[in-house]
From Swiss-Prot:
Entry keyword Oxidoreductase: yes
Species whose genome carries this gene: Shewanella pealeana (strain ATCC 700345 / ANG-SQ1)
Protein function: Catalyzes the last two steps in the biosynthesis of 5-methylaminomethyl-2-thiouridine (mnm(5)s(2)U) at the wobble position (U34) in tRNA. Catalyzes the FAD-dependent demodification of cmnm(5)s(2)U34 to nm(5)s(2)U34, followed by the transfer of a methyl group from S-adenosyl-L-methionine to nm(5)s(2)U34, to form mnm(5)s(2)U34.
Principal subcellular localisation of the protein: cytoplasm
Record-level GO BP terms: methylation; tRNA wobble uridine modification
Lineage: Bacteria, Pseudomonadati, Pseudomonadota, Gammaproteobacteria, Alteromonadales
FAD-dependent cmnm(5)s(2)U34 oxidoreductase: annotated span: 232-641
EC number: 2.1.1.61, 1.5.-.-
Subcellular location(s) of the protein: Cytoplasm
Superkingdom classification of source: Bacteria
Protein keywords: Cytoplasm, FAD, Flavoprotein, Methyltransferase, Multifunctional enzyme, Oxidoreductase, S-adenosyl-L-methionine, Transferase, tRNA processing
Reactions listed under catalytic activity: 5-aminomethyl-2-thiouridine(34) in tRNA + S-adenosyl-L-methionine = 5-methylaminomethyl-2-thiouridine(34) in tRNA + S-adenosyl-L-homocysteine + H(+)
Family the entry assigns: In the N-terminal section; belongs to the methyltransferase superfamily. tRNA (mnm(5)s(2)U34)-methyltransferase family. In the C-terminal section; belongs to the DAO family.
InterPro entries: FAD-dep_OxRdtase, FAD/NAD-bd_sf, tRNA_MAMT_biosynth_bifunc_MnmC, tRNA_S-uridine_synth_MnmC_C
UniProt protein name: tRNA 5-methylaminomethyl-2-thiouridine biosynthesis bifunctional protein MnmC
Length: 641
């Protein structure tokens, strides 16, 4: 049988709506095209294809293949990049999701967070898979992630010897070959395999205990007693979350206190999209690269679907503004062998050519980055959620209280009550700490004033986003944006003349002596002020809302001893059931927010998230407290950690 026929029979045999197929090896573009076409035709099912691909010269070329990018998004280019980790692509009008896991097979499989028991319906191995990695320890990882009746198949181009060896290894972990017209049967020795799988899943969950992964009791059908999922917010993060939930068939209601979407931190005329990189490419840096790629995909996909979005992926030129920052920029670009599509070193001459203006410093160029209108991005994401699953929006509705009762969340405004909702997500930016349940979250508000200056003379030639001490965008509707101020716990969001001048000074300081800087005119007092919530480690907050009262109660009995460290390592940290947090996006929420939203939607619905277990820990809202508890350090609520 061909691979397509085998997988078609596996898919057809499943009674559940969600079907997951795993594959080791990328295969040829022709075969991958056949597979994607096959999966896309199953309109009655929600299909996920998980491709585990070793990073090599060959796979890098295939990932960049123009035919593949066109296949993934016929109306717009989707860029895959050979970096380790998961890159999620949503195709076929959200009925097919493809996760590209790049790197060593075993490493990628072991990094997957456990959301529920086995979820993979069938595994396939292509002839181009690295057979040196196909060892017994790998097959046990496949089994750990599989349903009990999951099937196993190989390309028919394998030699008879290789087929015999691989099928034997698969059978030893309870994965059986799919035979023509014969449904899989549980073998007599499988109970031992199933027990081993359960033990491996328990081990994985134990590793996740400090940063729990919690699904909600949601269904795809709202009822009188269950109105689905509520989101409090109104910016890019909440709109992208609504879209990710809608793609899973969820009924979503978004509560926004303003007269329209994107009136707070997401209300700027232009916002830059580019990754946050570190010299050592730490976990934060790795997350931002994957998030950046997903954000670009979301943006391009929404635009291709006809949503009006002002954006220009014209690239971002990042230079230093003094000796210290120049050394930092050099340390970043020289610290790793970055993929050229992510970041590459440029000279002063190259920077000037790219930007269209004279620049005296070299630095970093992010070729796929650029700017987007956050308001347009927000509206497009929500309108798409409304189109595919009827997401609803309640404007001018300020929620003043949230209350958990009888297995659901009830919301109260000044005039109405809403609910009950099986899940509630707080994605309300600067107000994320307004409720008792989240008042101690470690995120701080920073006021940011963005100045608007008319495009004129030499300044009008700017053709890429500039980033140094401050940032400046190419013109859109005859205006450039530059900024932004950074004022902690500011008392208001009124226009500030001093901050307007400070924004100009930042550009002057960054590009000393350049004639084009003289064309920047801030005298029109045109600006916009917002508040972005910033975490100390610069990572977003995504996950179940921590129950700090319960944590502190347990802390009284488990603190400052070796035994207490073991306790926090092995017990699930307390959370508020059905309550989730999406916030702390800081100044790069356009880059980090959409993937955080997609991951949270997956967690809520009990799906596998497109991020690693390390990323789950990085983003978890309880991480500041848990880092201290896991080290046996003292904990004090209300103090920044």
């Amino acid at each position: 049988m061909t691979v397509s026929k085998i997988l078609k029979q596996i898919i057809d045999s499943q009674t559940t709506k969600n079907v997951v197929i795993g594959q080791l090896g990328l295969g040829s573009i022709t075969k991958l095209k056949q597979l994607i076409t096959l999966l896309a035709h199953h309109k009655d099912k929600q299909l996920t294809l998980k491709l585990f691909v070793d990073i090599s010269d060959t796979s890098g070329i295939l990932l960049a293949n123009e035919e593949l990018t066109t296949l993934l998004c016929p109306q717009g280019s989707i860029s895959l990049t050979a970096i380790e980790g998961c890159q999620r692509v949503i195709v076929s009008n959200c009925k097919l999701t493809i996760d590209f896991y790049l790197g060593q097979y075993l490493t990628q499989l072991q990094a997957l967070p456990m959301v529920n028991d086995g979820f993979v319906d069938g595994w396939h191995v292509t002839s181009d898979a690295d057979q040196t990695q196909l060892r017994q320890i790998l097959f046990w990882q496949l089994a750990k992630l599989s349903k009990n009746d999951a099937q196993f198949s190989l390309d028919d181009t394998f030699t008879e010897v290789s087929q015999l060896e691989l099928y034997t290894q698969a059978e030893q972990v309870g994965l059986y070959r799919y035979a023509d017209n014969i449904p899989g049967n549980i073998q007599s020795g499988d109970e031992i395999c199933f027990q081993e799988r359960a033990a491996m899943r328990a081990q994985s969950r134990a590793l996740q205990a400090p940063y729990p992964i919690c699904s909600a009791a949601v269904t795809t059908h709202a009822t009188c007693s269950n109105l689905g999922i509520a989101i409090i917010g109104g910016g890019v993060a909440s709109a992208c979350l609504a879209l990710s939930l809608a793609e899973r068939g969820q009924q979503v209601t978004l509560f926004c206190e303003d007269h329209a979407l994107a009136q707070a931190a997401s209300g700027n005329k232009q916002g830059a999209i580019y990754p946050l990189l570190t010299p050592d490419n730490n976990t934060l840096s790795q997350y931002f690269q994957q998030a950046y790629l997903f954000s670009l995909q979301r943006l391009k996909s929404l635009a291709a679907q006809g949503h009006p979005i002002d954006f220009d992926l014209c690239g971002v030129v990042h230079t230093g503004h003094d000796e210290r920052s120049r050394k930092r920029v050099a340390k970043i670009i020289n610290g790793q062998n970055w993929q050229p599509s992510i970041a590459r070193a440029i000279t002063a001459e190259q920077a000037s050519s790219i930007a269209g203006l004279k620049i005296d410093d070299g630095g970093i160029f992010y070729p796929m980055g650029g700017w987007v209108s956050p308001q347009d991005f927000t509206r497009a994401a929500f309108n798409q959620a409304k189109a595919i699953a009827g997401a609803s929006l309640k404007l001018n509705t300020q929620i003043t209280d949230i209350h958990y009762k009888d297995g659901g969340w009830e919301l109260t405004s000044n005039t109405e009550r809403f609910g009950s909702f099986k899940a509630l997500i707080l994605a309300n930016g600067k107000s994320i700490t307004q409720f008792p349940q989240t008042q101690y979250l470690q995120a701080t508000g920073f006021r940011g004033q963005v100045s608007h200056v008319p495009s004129r003379a030499k300044l009008s030639k700017l053709s890429s986003v500039l980033c140094a001490h401050g940032y400046m965008t190419p013109s859109n509707n005859t205006l450039h944006c530059l900024g932004a101020s950074y004022v902690k716990n500011a008392p208001n969001t009124d226009y500030c003349p001093n901050e307007q001048v400070e924004n100009l000074h930042k550009i002057q300081h960054s590009y000393v002596g350049q004639e084009w800087v003289e064309d920047i005119d801030v005298s029109g007092h045109s600006a916009r002020v917002g508040v972005r919530m910033v975490t100390r480690d610069h990572a977003p907050m995504m996950g179940p809302a921590p129950d700090i009262d319960s944590i502190m109660t347990l802390y009284q009995d488990h603190q400052l001893t070796p035994q207490s460290r073991k306790y926090w390592q092995s017990h699930n940290a307390p959370v508020h059931q059905g309550l989730y947090v999406l916030g702390g996006l800081g100044s790069r929420g356009l880059s980090s927010g959409p993937l955080a939203a997609e991951s949270l939607a997956a967690q809520i619905c009990g799906d596998l998230m497109p991020i690693s277990r390390d990323f789950v820990a990085l983003l978890n809202p309880n991480r500041m407290w848990m880092r201290k508890l896991l080290k046996g350090k003292a904990l004090e609520v209300g103090v920044e950690v």
